[in-house]
């Protein structure tokens, strides 16, 4: 079991001009070691912004992966229940305070801790607010 944490101040699909995947996105997928990994996008920090979600689905859909979106502003329970299926959890930019508060309320922090301790490679990625959520202090 290996856990990779890849964090950046910005970049990836959300910064590409046409919404296409970047080398960073391909690298994150490659780290999973799976042929068709499940990639979960967590747009919580942006209040589950619909255009951000569409951009993710377009970019990652072209990479031959399976995709899911962790939505906590609507249908949170079902979304959190599916989270352990993810090989890669990619957390988007926005408000770190909102992100952490909603994760605690809905138990996402506990689910992620369990995922990290499992006998399976897990990749955790994030941009901006999504980068800072992986650290304490």
Task: Give a label for each model feature.
Residues 1-92:
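N-terminal beta1-alpha1 cap of cysteine-dependent amidohydrolase-like domains
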Residues 95:
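Phosphate-centric recognition/catalysis
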Residues 98-137:
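Class I SAM-dependent methyltransferase SAM-binding "motif I" and its flanking Rossmann-like core
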């Amino acid at each position: 079991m290996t856990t990779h944490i890849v964090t950046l101040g910005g970049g990836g699909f959300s910064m590409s001009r046409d919404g296409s995947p970047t080398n960073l996105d391909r690298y994150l997928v490659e780290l999973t070691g799976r042929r068709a990994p499940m990639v979960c996008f967590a747009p919580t920090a942006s209040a589950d912004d619909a255009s951000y979600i569409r951009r993710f689905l377009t970019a990652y859909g072209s990479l031959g992966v399976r995709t899911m979106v962790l939505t906590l502003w609507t249908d949170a329970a079902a979304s959190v229940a599916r989270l352990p299926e993810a090989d890669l959890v990619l957390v988007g930019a926005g408000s770190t305070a909102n992100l952490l508060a909603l994760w605690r309320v809905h138990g996402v922090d506990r689910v992620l801790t369990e995922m990290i301790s499992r006998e399976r490679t897990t990749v955790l990625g994030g941009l901006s607010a999504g980068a800072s959520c992986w650290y304490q202090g």
